[in-house]
Amino acid sequence: MSRRRFAERGSEDSRDGSDRLLREAGERLGGSPPRLRRSGVFVRVLRDARPYAPQIGALTLLSLLATPLALLLPVPLKIAVDSVIGSHPPPGILDAVLPAAATNSDTGLLITVALMFVAFAFLSQLVELATLVLGTHTGERLLILFRCRLFLHVQRLSLAYHDRRDIGESAYRIQWDASNLRDLAEAVFPLLAGLSMFIGILIVTVLINWQLALVALTVGPFVIVVARIYGRRLRSEWHTAERFESRGLSVVQETLSAMRVVTAFGQERREASRFVDRAWAGSHARRRLASVQGMLALLIGLITAIGTAAVLIVGVTQVNSSAITLGELLIVMAYLTLLYQPLEDMGKKVADLQEALAGIERAYSVLDEVPEVQQRRNARPLRRATGEIGFRAVSFAYRQQAPVLDDVWLRVEPGSFVGLVGATGAGKTTLVSLLTRFYDPTGGQIRLDGEDLRNYKIADLRSQFAIVLQEPVLFSTSIAENIAYGRPRADPDAIVEAARAANAHDFIAGLPDGYDTQVGDRGMLLSGGERQRVSLARAFLRDAPILIMDEPTSAVDVATERAIIEAVGRLAEGRTTLLITHRPSVQLRCERILRVDGGRVVDGGRPRAHQSPMPRIRERDMFPGAEPRSRR
């Protein structure tokens, strides 16, 4: 048997980093479900970004530092035109800080202004590099923390939420919508830098020539109005496009997870057509979005071009009248380019911002979902239950549908082996789903060890159960890690012992990689019987006081069924066991049979007698001394 890898759990550094991140994400979620929040997206993002306030502060300073550097870049051009080409004296500050040789001759002055330009450009690029590195680091940390919060929260949501949602939609919101948090940062800081640049250049331009500054400013209100009008349309279009894309992803995931069925029925073209329909709808939404973006960029570009032309006309007129020098006009035109550049970029930045806001709103809508199954504030811990189960007048219906269970009274003694039988859809699986608090009953009370389930902490309650499903659920990892899924830190010897108890060790040891064997997606590299025995081994290792099995032998051959039944017998020893099955051979292993029929539970007695007429379980039989509930 190979133990080369299955005892490993990844590198310590990686695991420690993941643990820290999960703890931080869990702390941000808090111990209770989040309440619906109505604060603005920006406010929520800022609140979530508080752990990275120092980095965000540094990014803000870098954005502000870019403004004076940008203002200095055109200065060498003005000096060269006015003092090297023209006859105007160089600025006095140069004489104060530079040796006379650098300013007394045209050659020295030209070399000086050239070096100034290189120095200013280098510093500007250095600030841009620092902004890129720090921004990427901060954005990625924010993103992975936000994704962890989303993923943890989605797993905490009740099964009723997942019953109503496509897997693809949830995956899209975690993987893609969440990434808009990073995109928002990438859009906000350039806008902040652009605003700082706009103010700085405006001040300098006013100092040079207030008339030209006034002419340049006339386009501002038009740009703001256009950006606001198209900004609302852009966010709406982004919501539409992302909705269609998530639907397309749902089709892909659904089809790939059911490839055997799709291939067996020859429905590849049908599924491709279904995907194309959704992809085409998404493509159409993207084309509409591109049209809106293009129109916004066109209008802003036209407005700034008109502003530039107006400044040029007024500026040339003033040069001809000797009101300003040619160098002053050139520096104003250079500043005007810098002034209008943020406005011209606004089309793209506004589009990026609206895309980010639309995605973040969708992601936050998931965080705003409140689990239907909630933990009470004063919930008590539960170490290990004895396994006594009681249902008192329990009713349940799925979201306004007809009741699946109605007035169920049931008592299971600790350590007993009970079989649940009944027609398909009678409510057997619903019964055990209520016991594990995947759902809460719409009426009545379920008790464990004499205490209402809702009085226990949810995590402690669910740790009392080991579950073996009709269709075994394995993860795309090694056999050992699948067996240890309920006890991730189990030692290798315990894993092997659990496999032996489940009659799985022999086939595992016969595999080339033994317990290190990768099982593939959903365990499809193993046979159905092998998957079921690995699932049983997982239940053995879990060592929970209550065992729930849902048709564990429904899809295996006779020999495999015999091996599984033997393992089930060992697994049930000393545990309260609920076994859902239709097979008489499996029912014979049970101490008692309960039939679920018409939303009620009837007692079938011993296994061999369960086919005879069965009386409905009465509450006074199950709970001596209980008063019958009044009937209407």
Q: Where are each of the predicted segments found?
A:
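Cytosolic ends of transmembrane helices, especially the final helix of ABC transmembrane type-1 domains
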Residues: 244, 267, 291, 338-366
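Juxtamembrane helix-loop junctions of ABC transporter transmembrane domains
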Residues: 30-38, 61-62, 69-86, 116, ...
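An intracellular "coupling" helix at the cytosolic face of ABC transporter transmembrane type-1 domains
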Residues: 50-54, 159-160, 176-184, 188, ...
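Transmembrane helices of ABC transporter permease
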Residues: 55-68, 189-240, 311-324, 341
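Hydrophobic alpha-helical segments in the permease module
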Residues: 117-124, 128, 220-227, 293-307, ...
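ABC-type nucleotide-binding domain
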Residues: 375-376, 382-632
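Membrane-integrated ABC transporters
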Residues: 1-73, 85-117, 123, 127-135, ...
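Conserved catalytic Walker-motif region of ABC-type ATPase nucleotide-binding domains
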Residues: 154, 275, 363, 391-393
